[in-house]
Structure formats: structure tokens, C-alpha cells
Design a protein with these regions (language model features):
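N-terminal, motif-rich segments that launch catalysis or mediate targeting to/interaction with membranes
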Residues: 1-73, 78-81, 99-203
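Catalytic Zn2+-binding segment of zinc metalloproteases
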Residues: 90-102
Length: 203
């Protein structure tokens, strides 16, 4: 939301502040009961975890559609929670392991590093403008492709802490900018709901 304010999207920022608790519930829910198993997507072969048709691409689109569905029914609690869950999936895809689909490639260590250092390292935050795309699929493809590029860029760095720092600097900024972009897209889609009286289906 800080990025939205910095870029002058005050109306949008205030809207999301109202429903921040619901969004946070969705962010947490997205990782519960092994749902994170499907937060993987390789943009090269367009697949997630082996043997499963559900992946970060299908899940993010499903959550987004459900968010629109519930809000079209005036159910902001579930609608904003689904939006938060969608944001979680989009954010996960900025991490190389989620795009490479390799659970054992220092995945937990990297996430622990980010949790421990996110508030301490100023370079992990950005005020750059939101990334604007037309749909959720574009965000999934861009974030996962960027994650693969980060992995390639820093793969030969021997020191794990240095590698984590460099990947986190880029991945976290991408996460913030893409989330802000999704917020703007979702806000605009909600405005269309009011104007068009469009019917959405639960996915």
C-alpha cells in the first residue's frame, strides 16, 4: 500500500486499508493445509508440481475469480480474503525455487532468511511504481520468468548469505511492485462490477 500512496493512488490505498485484516487472513490461509504445495509454476514448460494440473497459474486465476465473485455478492470478507490469497501466490513466484519447482534447493533457508531480515534491510523495500499488466496470467508469467532469471544470474555465487541477499533484493522489490499492480487491476475490476452489473461464477 505504501507504493500506491507514493504514486498518488490515494483512493485505492484507502480502500485496501479498510479491508487489510481480510486480506491478511487470505495471505495466511493460502499457506495452510499444504495449499502451498501448489504455489509452483515453471513458465517454460507451463507446469507446477509433477503429476498435478493445479499450479500457481491455475490457483492465482481461480482465487482472483473467486474474489470478484464474492464481492459481486457484496461479501467483502471472503472476497478480500481470496484477493489476499491470490497475492500470496503471486508473491511466492518471485522466489526462484517456486519457478524452478525445487523444494529442496535451500527453499526453507531462503524464506527463513527473508523473514529474519526483511524489516532490517532497507534495500529490501522499494518505492518504485506498480507493475501494470492486463491480467493475472501476465503477473504469473512475469514473476516466474523473473525468478528464473535471478536464479541464473546468481547461481555461481558460493557464499549462501550473499546469494540470499542479492536474490532477496530483487525478488522482494518485484513482489511489492507486482502486488501493487494487482491491487490497481483489482480495484478497476471492482469499479466495473458496479457499472456493468456483471455476473461472476465461483471457481
Amino acid at each position: 500500500m505504501d507504493i500506491l500512496k507514493e504514486d498518488g493512488y490515494d483512493t485505492e490505498a484507502k480502500f485496501y486499508e479498510i479491508f487489510e485484516s481480510y486480506i491478511n487472513e487470505g495471505l495466511v490461509w493460502a499457506d495452510q493445509d499444504f495449499k502451498s504445495y501448489f504455489h509452483f509454476y515453471n513458465p517454460k514448460n507451463k507446469r507446477g508440481m509433477y503429476g498435478h494440473s493445479t499450479n500457481a497459474m491455475t490457483l492465482a486465476n481461480s482465487y482472483y475469480k473467486n474474489a470478484l465473485y464474492f464481492i459481486s455478492k457484496n461479501d467483502y470478507k471472503n472476497g478480500m480474503a481470496y484477493f489476499g490469497a491470490m497475492c500470496h501466490v503471486i508473491q511466492d513466484l518471485t522466489i526462484p525455487q517456486h519457478a524452478k519447482i525445487k523444494l529442496l534447493d535451500s527453499h526453507k533457508q531462503f524464506e527463513s532468511y527473508v523473514k529474519s531480515n526483511y524489516k532490517k534491510v532497507k534495500r529490501f523495500k522499494t518505492n518504485e511504481s506498480p507493475l501494470l499488466y492486463k491480467n493475472i496470467s501476465d503477473y504469473v508469467n512475469f514473476n516466474s520468468t523473473s525468478a528464473l532469471n535471478l536464479d541464473y544470474m546468481y547461481k555461481n555465487i558460493p557464499n549462501q548469505q550473499t546469494k540470499f541477499y542479492l536474490v532477496a533484493c530483487n525478488a522482494l522489490k518485484l513482489s511489492q511492485r507486482s502486488t501493487a499492480g494487482c491491487m490497481l487491476m483489482f480495484f478497476n475490476d471492482l469499479e466495473k462490477i458496479k457499472q456493468e452489473d456483471k455476473i461472476y461464477e465461483y471457481n
